[in-house]
Amino acid sequence: MVWNVEREFGPNCAFPLWAEIAEARRLVMYDGLGSGLSDRSFEDISIENSVADLAAVVDAAGLEKFAICSSCMGAQAAISYAAAHPDRVEKMVLIGGFSRGLMHRQPTAKQIAQRELMLEALEIGWDDPIPAFRLLDQLSAFPQATLEEQLRMTEMLQSTTSGRNTVKYFRAQSETDVSSQARHVQCPTLIAHARESARIPFDEGCRLAGLIPNAQFLPLDGKDTVPTPSNPAFRVVVDATRAFLQEGDLGSAGNGLGVHLTPREGEVLELMAQGLDNLQIAAHLGLSEKTVRNHITPIFDKLSVDNRGRAIVKAREAGLGLRRA
């Protein structure tokens, strides 16, 4: 997919969703061929080659079993890979995804004309210092995002690839249908889709959920293809995805507390039970003190306590805090 990992882990991150979802997990991201730090001169952009990109990254990272999280244009490659490698993909999350591109949905003449107009505007205006043409894409995909968020996304995309390659990515996904592959996906799958999605119709999300056996479907309020932080659906999809990915994680269900804690929350509570304060916990885990506080709030909620002392009592009653950091 079109991405720029180097930029996305800086202070001006345009798409913070994945980092939020992957907290306390290993997150592997990559720049697809034709974008980011990968070969920008690569011309043969297709869903098949996007699948090959994904396979190469998986092998290079030494991943034996893992979860795939994808959105929008990356969903087709994720579906294809998961169907072909059921022994490696444990879970899959698709946000604003689809199996069939526009040209496989019996588009009207108006829809085709609108697509061609937008693609022409993107290619011609991609390098303009004024982002008007690039904003056409963001306005259709993220109509609820703030102007600041939209501008940040256009800046990230412009720094990532060329207008020509962007158009190639759009054409590749709009002319591809992976519905048959979706039927062969075997892993548990969560599909989240905005009810009023301006880019990918809600019906396409529902259809995809019907194709993948036993998929879970999460309808989201709003119009953004993928919710941005200013959208209330952002927190909904982050929390739902975390819960979906953590189901069955060792140390969560069997912690003796009778509640489901994330791995990071479990670490924080263990250190609290050992008597460490927030500053000491932050140093031990390599986090900021603010991040530690942000973990403690949901711990209190899950334990149904209103202060640190009561949380520590519950933790020690469950056998936590016996080790020393």
Q: Could you say what each language-model-derived stretch is?
A:
Residues 1-39:
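Conserved HGGG/HGGXW glycine-rich cap/lid loop of the alpha/beta-hydrolase fold
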Residues 48-66:
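Conserved acidic catalytic loop of the alpha/beta-hydrolase fold
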Residues 198-204:
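Conserved alpha/beta-hydrolase "acid-adjacent" motif
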Residues 215-260:
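Catalytic active-site module of serine/aspartate enzymes centered on a nucleophile-bearing elbow/loop
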Residues 251-297, 302, 313, 317-325:
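Helix-turn-helix DNA-binding segment
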